[in-house]
Amino acid sequence: MSTMTPLERTVAALTFKKPDRVPVILYFQSGVQHDVQELDYTWEEVLNHPRKLFQVVELQHTKYGADNFFLPVDFRVEGEALGSKLDYMLKCGGGMRMGVVSDWAVKTPSDVKKICIPDPTKAGRMPVILDVIRKLKKKYPDVPIAGFVNGPPDTVADVLEGRYKRLYVEMAKKSSFIHDLLELCTQTSIAFAKAMIEAGAGAIATVEGGMVDEAVSPDQYAEFVVPYHRKIRDAIGALGVPYIYHQCENATPFMDLIVDGIQPALVAFHDSVDLKWAKEKYGKKIAIAGNVSVSKSDAVLMFGTPEEVMAAAKKCIEIGMPGSGYWLSAGCEIHHGVPPENIKALVKAAALYGVYK
């Protein structure tokens, strides 16, 4: 089989056609601290400056060999655009931590109605993201770009004072303003997603980070998660763009709701999920990605050797590869502390073990 471009390879696997090899997809915070320090930037500079963000994101493909670009590389874009304030805390020896919310836009239920859907071409750091996507698309037309939107409940936690703790309480109380806030965050994500698509993104990825199995029930997931993600999925699906869904922690109790309710093109699994179970039960209905451990179990991507990473990746490839519909990826974000040599090992494993005959 002739060698495919990253775009051809990624689309083939997503649509259950046979690629030349398993694609390697990096997502969620795929800017590593090592590279930021090597470039002598702080995270505040990277996240607010188009040229510097471009330099860091570009390395996902040019340095590590991933089959995609992924941005934003932090989770606070929508929350900041909706009015929350960020601080960038210095950490001795570590450059700069990612931005953290220091002042929330919504303190009382009445605050929700004071906030308008932000214009992605003007609000916060959204224009920076759009500028970088346009530049990546122009320079690397054969490398797919995944634009990222926060899951609506996660954005709520970035704008609601009290974050998840208060969100869970308001959910239990069936507070109507939470649905109003979820709708505002959903429409913000839709507007941002459409702008990223117009700029050149070929897919929209999302994550559900706070609505995990240890915190919410399937009934709550069905009420507070599924309908809002489905609205995003439908909005971008109408443009012919796939929705890529990642559920943090153990997605097992929610999988039927995700597959049948949200209907994403692909689900990227955390390493808490049995990939063999997921492939056997859902692998003919949706494409899957995963799930080399980065945060739980042995966290091999974070703490293992390159050889251990390759061995773990080989096991995932052997499960996911048959019949196509599979991307090799980490079980959660390739965050900024992951050793560069381990990211390269993940990519190398696909070249050695993921070639289709």
Regions found by a protein language model. Give the residues of each.
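Residues forming anionic-ligand binding surfaces in small-molecule and nucleic-acid pockets
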Residues: V106-K113
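Short, structured active-site "lid" loops
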Residues: E44-Q55, T62-Y64
